[in-house]
UniProtKB/Swiss-Prot annotation:
GO terms for cellular component: extracellular region; host cell postsynaptic membrane. This is Alpha-conotoxin-like Cp20.4. The cysteine framework is XX (C-CC-C-CC-C-C-C-C). Alpha-conotoxins act on postsynaptic membranes, they bind to the nicotinic acetylcholine receptors (nAChR) and thus inhibit them. Through its two C-terminal domains, this homodimeric protein would bind to two nAChR allosteric sites, located outside the nAChR C-loop of the principal binding face and at the adjacent binding interface in a clockwise direction. This toxin specifically blocks mammalian neuronal nAChR of the alpha-7/CHRNA7, alpha-3-beta-2/CHRNA3-CHRNB2 and alpha-4-beta-2/CHRNA4-CHRNB2 subtypes. Belongs to the conotoxin D superfamily. The modification 4-carboxyglutamate is found at E50. It comes from Conus capitaneus.
Length: 95
């Protein structure tokens, strides 16, 4: 098979891998919205751990959620995890 024909076959077949059989929706998602959902589905990454406040009078502490929020976080009661496109996972405070 000549190179041109082979390339055309590859270009026609390759996009099929991005769609599931059920409804033709893209498997890779929208790059932003479902990144955190996929991350949380892998193991116990949404388990809460104790949050340590590093500065008195500040809402920022350390580690509100296991293996996810890193070193910048806030108390467990006001903390939620966010996913920043191209920057990864982090935390934000609700207050």
């Amino acid at each position: 098979m000549p190179k041109l024909e082979m390339m055309l076959v590859v270009l026609l077949i390759f996009p099929l891998f991005y769609f599931d059989a059920a409804g033709g929706q893209a498997v890779q998602g929208d790059r932003r919205g479902d990144g955190l959902a996929r991350y949380l589905q892998r193991g116990d990454r949404n388990d809460e751990s104790e949050c340590i406040i590093s500065t008195p009078g500040s809402s920022w502490g350390r580690c509100c959620l296991t293996r996810m929020c890193g070193t910048m976080c806030c108390p467990r009661s006001g903390c939620y995890c966010v996913y920043h496109w191209r920057r990864g996972h982090g935390c934000a405070c609700s207050d």
